[in-house]
A protein has these predicted regions:
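P-loop/Walker A NTP-binding region and its immediately flanking N-terminal helices
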Residues: 1-206
Length: 206
C-alpha cells in the first residue's frame, strides 16, 4: 500500500525537542548553580548592606581610602563576592576616561570589570589563606606588592579565610599592612573576626 496519505513521522527531532534535548548541532549552555548565576556584581545588587555601602561611598568621596578592609560573617553570606565588587569599584574606569577615581556607581561594565568578577585580572590577586598559611606565601605578596599595577588603578589583594594565617605569617605581613605602597589595597575575608590579624592591626570591619 502507498504511504502517501499517512501523517508524517514526528518522532525524529520533535520528540527530542520536547524533552529539551535539542538538535545535535545546538550548543548546550554550561550549567551554573544558582549561587553563581545570580551572584551580585555591584553594590546595587547587595541586600542589607546599606551601612557598609555608605561607609565605602564616604571614603571614596572624601578621598580617605584605607589601605585595607576586613569582611566578616558566616560562610556563604557573600564576603568574597563583596571583596570582588570592592576591587571593581576601586578600579572602575570607562573607555572614554570619564571616571577619574574609585566609585560605587557602576551602571555599566568598565574596562576591568569583567576580568575582576571572573577572578582573572592580573592586578586583582586572590589567595586562600586556608591552604596558604605559611611565611613563604606572605613573602610572595611582600615581594610583589612593591611593583605598580600593570593596567588598573590599584593592585588589590583579596585574602580569604585570613584567620587561618599562622602567627609567623601574619607577623611577616605586618610591615606591609602598616605601610603599603599607595597603589596597593588589601581586602580580607574571615568567618572568625577574633582570630583575624591576631590583634596586631586595626582595620575597618564590615
Amino acid at each position: 500500500m502507498s504511504d502517501a496519505g499517512a501523517p508524517p513521522d514526528k518522532s525524529d527531532g520533535a520528540g527530542q525537542s520536547g524533552l529539551g534535548l535539542g538538535s545535535p548541532g545546538e550548543a548546550a549552555k554550561p550549567y551554573r548553580v544558582l549561587a553563581r548565576k545570580y551572584r551580585p556584581s555591584s553594590f546595587d545588587d547587595l541586600i542589607g548592606q546599606e551601612a557598609m555601602v555608605r561607609t565605602v561611598s564616604n571614603a571614596f568621596e572624601t578621598g580617605r581610602i584605607p589601605q585595607a578592609w576586613i569582611l566578616t560573617g558566616v560562610r556563604g553570606v557573600g564576603k568574597t563576592t563583596t571583596a570582588r565588587i570592592l576591587a571593581r569599584a576601586l578600579n572602575y574606569e570607562k573607555p572614554d576616561g570619564s571616571v577619574k577615581g574609585p566609585t560605587i556607581h557602576m551602571p555599566d561594565l568598565g574596562v576591568h570589570c569583567q576580568a575582576i568578577m571572573e577572578s582573572r585580572h592580573m592586578d586583582v590577586l586572590e589567595m586562600d589563606a586556608a591552604s596558604h598559611t605559611g611565611v613563604d606565601d606572605v613573602r610572595q605578596i611582600n615581594d610583589s606588592v612593591r611593583y605598580a599595577p600593570a593596567s588598573a588603578r590599584y593592585k588589590v589583594y583579596i585574602i580569604d579565610e585570613v584567620h587561618m594565617l599562622s602567627t609567623a605569617a601574619f607577623n611577616a605581613f605586618l610591615k606591609t599592612l602598616e605601610e603599603p605602597p599607595e597603589h596597593a589595597k588589601f581586602v580580607f575575608a574571615t568567618t572568625e573576626i577574633q582570630g583575624a590579624g591576631h590583634g596586631t592591626v586595626a582595620l575597618p570591619a564590615f
